[in-house]
Amino acid sequence: MQGSVTEFLKPRLVDIEQVSTTHAKVTLEPLERGFGHTLGNALRRILLSSMPGCAVTEVEIDGVLHEYSTKEGVHEDILEILLNLKGLAIKVEGKDEVILTLNKSGAGPVVAGDITHDGDVEIANPEHVICHLTDDHAEISMRIKVERGRGYVPASARIHTEEDERPIGRLLVDATYSPVDRIAYSVEAARVEQRTDLDKLVIDMETNGTLDPEEAIRRAATILAEQLDAFVDLRDVRVPEEKEEKPEFDPILLRPVDDLELTVRSANCLKAEAIHYIGDLVQRTEVELLKTPNLGKKSLTEIKDVLASRGLSLGMRLENWPPASIAED
């Protein structure tokens, strides 16, 4: 085997053994020693927790107000029916949620294939039993909400957020979105030419039928690669720029009225009214200033002209005035 001792072997997909439509074994080799467990454990965790899928989240059954009740003519109690509904393997194309209906009457089993749905919905286990009707006069009708999601979301996590809007009789269901039912991996010895210290990774996986096992492996590997992309070139990691804080007020408003270079008469009148800063002045109205002793229309006109030359005017509204720096003074 040629190549530098520092080079890593690049594994290849050796074999995909399709045990059944929902069960497959995927073999990957050769791997450097230890990488079998490194990759196997990472892929296993992603396959179990991060594969998106669809699950039943809410159910409404005619004549049923809560999950701790029973329904006449139905062998199972409501809790058992909800548990059976969790076992539905549903695939939805192009939608994040759908409402399915189920209406059945007459003695016999009620199965997933009895559910009414459109072409965007596929039920992978139509023979899955939901409940049993005990006599010819028994009937059951329900509306089933199916949502797309990821991982496991217990019903208790949605109770408080939906409590005000949820009508009586709408039953929440623990949602297991992952289409992967079981995943295990093993690491065996592999050999390439004279090297016998290599790993062979065998991933044994079962799905609920809504996702092909081979496709599941590809998706998990893609997720892992995308998460590691940030480490490939750390120079691409952008350091957030520190935003320059904008002053709360225009600096000119913080300057003393003396900077306006008013006549002595006008300046003294303003100081007598405790108007020390330009920000204090612009908040006054013409009427208020005319009430100031010894300040007439001539002085008012002067003040207005000086303010206008600086893009200011009387009667302005300043939120949070005065600023802390002035208030402390």
From Swiss-Prot:
A single cellular component GO annotation: cytoplasm
Annotated region described as Alpha N-terminal domain (alpha-NTD), given as residue ranges: 1-235
MF-aspect GO terms: DNA binding; DNA-directed RNA polymerase activity; protein dimerization activity
Record field: catalytic activity: RNA(n) + a ribonucleoside 5'-triphosphate = RNA(n+1) + diphosphate
Keywords: DNA-directed RNA polymerase, Nucleotidyltransferase, Transcription, Transferase
InterPro entries on file: DNA-dir_RNA_pol_insert (IPR011262), DNA-dir_RNA_pol_RpoA/D/Rpb3 (IPR011263), DNA-dir_RpoA (IPR011773), RBP11-like (IPR036603), RNAP_asu_C (IPR011260), RNApol_insert_sf (IPR036643)
Keyword Acetylation recorded: no
GO biological process: DNA-templated transcription
Chain residue ranges for the region called Alpha C-terminal domain (alpha-CTD): 249-329
EC number: 2.7.7.6
Record bears the keyword Transcription: yes
UniProt domain comment: The N-terminal domain is essential for RNAP assembly and basal transcription, whereas the C-terminal domain is involved in interaction with transcriptional regulators and with upstream promoter elements.
Function (record text): DNA-dependent RNA polymerase catalyzes the transcription of DNA into RNA using the four ribonucleoside triphosphates as substrates.
HAMAP family per the UniProt record, alphabetical: RNApol_bact_RpoA (MF_00059)
Family, per entry: Belongs to the RNA polymerase alpha chain family.
Subunit structure: Homodimer. The RNAP catalytic core consists of 2 alpha, 1 beta, 1 beta' and 1 omega subunit. When a sigma factor is associated with the core the holoenzyme is formed, which can initiate transcription.
NCBIfam families linked to this entry: PRK05182.1-2, PRK05182.2-5, rpoA
Name the record gives this protein: DNA-directed RNA polymerase subunit alpha
Species annotation: Photobacterium profundum (strain SS9)
Recorded name of the encoding gene: rpoA
